[in-house]
Amino acid sequence: KHNWLVKDVNDLADIMNQAFEIATTGRPGPVLVDIPKDIQFNKGVYKVNKSNLVKKLNGSLSNKINLKDVNKFIEMIKKSSKPIFYTGGGVINSGPKASELLKELVSLTGFPITSTLQGLGAYPGDDPQFLGMLGMHGTYEANNAMHDCDLMINIGARFDDRITGKIDEFSPKSKKIHVDIDPSSIGKNVKVDLAITSDVTELLQSVIKIFKEKNKNFISSNKQKTAKWWTQIEKWREKKSLNYVNSKKTIKPQHAVQRLYELTKDQDTFITTEVGQHQMWAAQHYKFNKPNRWMTSGGLGTMGYGLPAAIGVQIAHPKKLVVDIAGEASILMNIQEMSTAIQYRLPIKIFILNNEYMGMVRQWQELLHDKNYSESYTEALPDFVKLAEAYGAVGIRAKTPDELDEKIREMINTDKPVIFDCVVDKAENCYPMIPSGKPHNQMLLGPEDEKEEVSDEGKTLV
């Protein structure tokens, strides 16, 4: 978000105060403080920042909510017959209170809700009003509801390309509300009808307060208006778009994530991921009911993120179960950090869905490159059990569905760092998916849908 070059050691205290303030306020983001070596050897006087004067950047926030905007927000809700809440990481960044307020507003309205990858956990994943994740690998019901809605209420999301699909066919008939703390995100990709620059918590508090005062029996009075909408959503749900063909001989990656969820859901579990198919399967099949239990790289999509993230989470929550759901390729990007986990006695669990491929690359090679699997197959993988033992960790391997539960329990009950090598089906692809260059309502639900060729325009958008 900003950077400083320290030229005088006596400026360092003020710069550090500014750096922490700018990094953590508004839309959170990294800052850089460059301290040259000669400055590092100087001594200065530390001054407490009493003025709270912070360097103003583009996108700074007034923190004043316009009541006209709040009233218009509520009026648009009241007029809608096919609404949907579309929520993102901004809800989680706003703090735990924002998630509580979001649940209250969704309950007050009776509207369906979907979430981006980074917003998972802001709303309970097992609630019947939750349609699952939306976007490129989102559910059939979430994506079709986004396409067909007449009111889209975007709270803390940014209309990124993984969500919108073909942007000129994105939700063509809907009115759109966009709430974001960063004004530069509003109107950047999608034109909206009501733009509100605000912290999510503050906006939701204002909306709920006025909504309760003026619409005490909203759900019962509005039920008939949205009945057809919910009927349509239930028809989309009947597609069961996250279903897959299970196997008694081979572990399906979706099954592995489901079993991990079932065996850990009664604990306060923290999940990190690497980047790839395993990341999407985790988002689809592991249900998050609290914020800040899901840490994943969704913007840059950096392979190698999950292991150091798990280390950080374990240090912050030393008595909690922390699992990095990984791919065999991504985990090798930062595998040296296992020594950090060993050195600091951090009992993280690395749960590798090992299909011997960079699976997401392979899936796109099937769609776009006539199955020319260039550089996506890894023949010379290490033995992950022996690799774990070499670091001083515990190695566990599961090859068949029959032994999976027992091995997962062994992993959970081991009070040391664990590398779990879960050998899964090599050919399994991640569905559903929106092909590149297509709108929300043209999804691939399985291999049988892949026959339609991706357009040249779509190929350039991957």
Segments (PLM) and residue ranges:
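Glycine-rich, acidic loop regions that bind phosphate or pyrophosphate groups
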Residues: K1-D14, K37, G119-K228, I408
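Conserved thiamine diphosphate
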Residues: K1-F41, L117-L120, M146, G156-H178, ...
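Conformationally flexible catalytic loops at phosphate/diphosphate-handling active centers
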Residues: Q18, I22-K79, L242, M443-L445
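Glycine-rich phosphate/diphosphate-binding loops that line cofactor/substrate pockets in enzymes
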Residues: E21-R27, D69-F85, L105, M146-D148, ...
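Glycine-rich beta-alpha junction loops
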Residues: I35-Q40, G89-V91, P183, V275-Q277, ...
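Glycine-rich, anion-gripping cofactor-binding loops and their flanking helix/strand elements
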Residues: G89-I177, F288-K320, L332-I335, E366-L367, ...
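Thiamine diphosphate
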Residues: N143, D148, G187-N189, A195-T197, ...
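Active-site diphosphate/adenylate-binding microenvironment
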Residues: T231-P308, V313
